[in-house]
Amino acid sequence: MTRHVRPVLFLAFVVAAASYTSGAGQALPPGEHPAGFADAVLGRWDLTVEGVEGPYPSWLLIHMRKDTQLQANFVGRFGSVRSATLTDFDNGQLTVVIPVQYEQQKTDLKFIGKVVGDKLEGTTEDEKGRTVKWTGARAPASTTTKPVNWGAPIQLLNQGDLTGWRQRSTAKGICWSVADGVLTNKTPCADLITEKTFTDFKLHVELMFPPKSNSGVYLRGRYEVQIQDDAGKPVDSHRMGGVYGFIAPYTNATKPADEWQAYDITLIGRRVTVVLNGTTIIDNEIIPGITGGAIDSREGDPGPLMLQGDHGKISFRNITLTPSL
């Protein structure tokens, strides 16, 4: 993925036409509301959209632009985080308008919803203009307060077959294979997912890609650490070592293409540390939410390790995961 949006600049603007009156009887400017008007919708929301071809995940962060205005940030089923162009909560109705990124629509995405108990519920339109339902659950806290005890390391890859793994889709046939302990895809391909799921863990994985290729490692199947041919380039959250669209690496430790490289990644709650080729490039940073391409948005659940296989040629070896107890 190559669209470049700086990860932490969560900026949006609100356009609304309604005028309100404050408790002092003074009219508020258009687009503004009394303080505290949107407390029920503020925060991080894990969305599930009930698409016609099956459910898919999205993510929404609603926060204050100022006391009387809202702004929002959104992650769809693919792509990276983007800012909404309109965010409003009026008479119990939430409206979020989001610019198209990789979707096929010719008009902006529009999510309409309301608070139902401790959830959000609403509708949007799919790429063919069909109305579909969506629900939102509040995302869990970023990390655990308990000390982590580590179990025994697990070798996730054997020497000769795909035992313990499954393809996300077989529409293009079986496109992953293992030979002499090296896992390789043939393009076009699909993502590869472990049968086992994990909560907190330490991961070691070695990888190699040809020039201009692209892949990724999805932690719990939800948070992509980017793999890309980016040696010598300025750092960015969309480039090698970044948590896609959210967290840029501190430095570029990428080797040239066609060389074996190594990730050592620790994930505890939503806090992540990434070591690339022996250099710490992300240290105990909080991942705001799911990244595009995630398997689901259930951030509080254990999840698998997923290797991205639908973007380019990639090889992996020595995949070792140490789970928490």
List each model region and its residues:
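N-terminal secretory signal peptides that target proteins for export/translocation
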Residues: 1-5
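Bacterial N-terminal signal peptides
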Residues: 8-19
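Boundary at the C-terminal end of the N-terminal hydrophobic targeting segment
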Residues: 21-27
